[in-house]
């Protein structure tokens, strides 16, 4: 019985129904599997390889058709496959199902995945269940092919009351569940699949990218047009900006480096070490520097930082006459008394920031003493912080690092350069340097502290000052190039270069200048230096006090302004109490020179800074030269001698500072818990600033930050290309300015709607009313009523023109009544002048139809104009007829003019897009319709001449080939199914656009290719089957007509 059913109901090879396609694919798979089992694969490896390739192709085909059947039968009951979102993009291929089936059979047969033995052992039972379930499904589907197959049916026609159909339904559900489970297990074993947490972290990274893009658009780093145009440069700019924003702007987001490493996204986990160091540097940048860095990351332009690195970021108070000297502004004019205009960085402001809090909380005598000591040191502090310090922030900085740090560094004394220290001293000094110079992390809004809060921590501050000031002698400050942290920005896992920090050549050059300047200062030591140590120590203590208190207690800007105003007078008074506004320039310069006796670890540009000041301060030039140029000793001090001198001087300075602290303030006990937490805050803030102190200038810092950030972001393009593409695609779609207009899928209900109108030579306007290259658009023409589709009518060109005009009027919702006399006249003239006059009069009719439409359907004017111009056209056509008859006679004696004309016409019509569908059959038909009317008055030669005239006219009107714009593509989201076979698209069945109609089709329905010269596409491109049939058929018909026309003309 089964044999009979198989013989009777066997699907034919051309049957396109799902069951028939499955039947033939399954038979092909069975044949290949049988051939594989028939020989030893080890004996014939080449044949075995070919058969295995065919086997996998057939498995793909069988599973693809099975998937379509399950999609139709199960529908929403299919097992969900949301886990595919976690798969890499490279895994989701069309042949994934075949790979899974092949892997399941291998595992079921006892094989194991390479280096995945444990996972293979776990998956083996599941693989056996999958292969067994799939075999059962194949048997049931083959049975359904022989029972319920309907030839060429697009849907399944199963008998749901039959037990075999119910059994097939349940078997498909079981197979679908097992296959989905095996897919997840197998792919997870083969490639790394994200966990739930990692997938959520990737989504947070996408949110960070989107927020970064919106911020960049807001501040003007990027343009909305770049986002709308999907600028490829944004693929590099957005990840770079996201790193900066994630580390600084959104510090608690997915790039929070304080979270454990295993909680960080796997995209940035390999770069955690370098990201922490980048974050520490970014936190010390001002707003202007951060903007310059972000702009550099977007445009790759050169860094242009005109503001010096040590330029103050604190705004000076309102200018007052003779209040300060300007040591930073080169354009200032110095008077004889040394007074100058107040600039952004003034010694008055620097001193005020150091002692205003001290003046608020201590007695009047202590306040005056502190102010005096600070004023005595202010010029040196200013010169270090403003012009020569390579580690402070530029002017707009919200977190200035110049004043406190440079003050405490400038107020310390030392005798030897840091290159002479031992390794242990280097380590200790670096920690002390961190504690001292982290003061620059403080925000300018927190310059003053609350008076009530000061007493709580004052005693502990005094205890901490001793250690900080004692460490200042050996602290290298801003002045040491990077000597120990050679891999400051070098991650352990990211293959970036080592040249991110200062090189040894730069370090050696800095040490040479420091040693030369140190030799000069050592010879300048005077007994008065001991007297200056106490003010130096006091200034350092005050600076450190303000630093520690700012870290502990916040204050408002209003308090800062009040304190500034109340302490301004006490700050600028002299120790004599005489009420002089400030010391003269010579007095200040003496203090400046005394400071240089003790502070040798200053920047190597400091010497040049004094020369620069000398040019603008004539009153101070003599003393400045005296203190710096009277030394003529060229010898070099040995390292051991400098080391001993450094140690001895450090011990003596420590003892003096201890006595000064004990005498001036005294030490008291403080709260241990508060002290420890306070110390942690100080050390943390100071560690953050230490990294910035290693760079010579702002340009150097920004350049190396750019190299590090760009290196990390660009490695994401390589290591996590798939994830980054998905994130960027989502970001672009979210941040587009406006979504595209919805484009509905056109429903092809009528065969005529599949054709586009293309004007023939009869449709060309040849009068002055319009260009001779103009044609009617598709909106103005009804193809069903046009003579392009009217092949069998023999009423002449005038009737076709009338129909076409009427169709155009219907399209435009206008009513155009043309007088019958005009068209009767037209037909009579056609009968008297041949087919050439028929074509031309039809053109005239079209011309006037268009003109009447534009002028408001003026019937009478149209009829009168038609009759007039038809008379003129008749005379011209008669002259042309005589000329063509003469050319025909020349052709009979060997002239090649008509043949060349015919050949040019043929070539031009073949290449012209506007005559693709208006083949020569219609022109010959028009000629044959007009020929009987002139049979009694013309000879056969005249008829041939008329045909040649028509060909010449066609050649004239089609010489200029116009390229049409390609059709708009339907978006992928608007086409869930193939527009031809209605098969739904899946992750394995991808969409393809037809270049001719713009529709969306599957790979089967759009597997043809053909050139489209009408769109300027001379090479073969993808087109759907319908367009291929239509285009190829029309082109072949046209070519055949053009080839037969010269033969007919020569035969006649």
UniProtKB/Swiss-Prot annotation:
The alphabetical list of record keywords is: Metal-binding, Phosphoprotein, Zinc, Zinc-finger
Metal-binding as a keyword of this entry, yes or no, is yes
Q: Which parts of the sequence bind Zn(2+) 1?
A: 978, 981, 1002, 1005
Q: Name one GO molecular function term.
A: zinc ion binding
The segment annotated Disordered runs over: 311-348, 379-455, 506-539, 551-678, 814-973
Decide whether keyword NADP is in the record.
Answer: no
Q: Where is the composition biased (Acidic residues)?
A: 422-455
Q: Which Pfam families match?
A: FYVE
What does the entry list as the binding residues for Zn(2+) 2?
Answer: 994, 997, 1024, 1027
Q: Which family does it belong to?
A: Belongs to the lst-2 family.
The source's superkingdom equals Eukaryota
Q: Where are the zinc fingers (FYVE-type)?
A: 972-1032
Please give the name of this protein: Lateral signaling target protein 2 homolog
Show the ranges annotated as biased composition (Basic residues): 588-614, 625-644
Q: Where is the composition biased (Low complexity)?
A: 312-346, 379-392, 400-419, 824-842, 872-915, 936-963
Provide ranges: composition bias, Polar residues. 554-574, 652-661, 926-935
Q: Which organism is it from?
A: Drosophila virilis (Fruit fly)
* A single Gene Ontology CC term: early endosome membrane
**Task performed by this protein:** Negative regulator of epidermal growth factor receptor (EGFR) signaling.
Q: Which residues form the signal peptide?
A: none
Phosphoserine modification, residue list: 555-556, 854
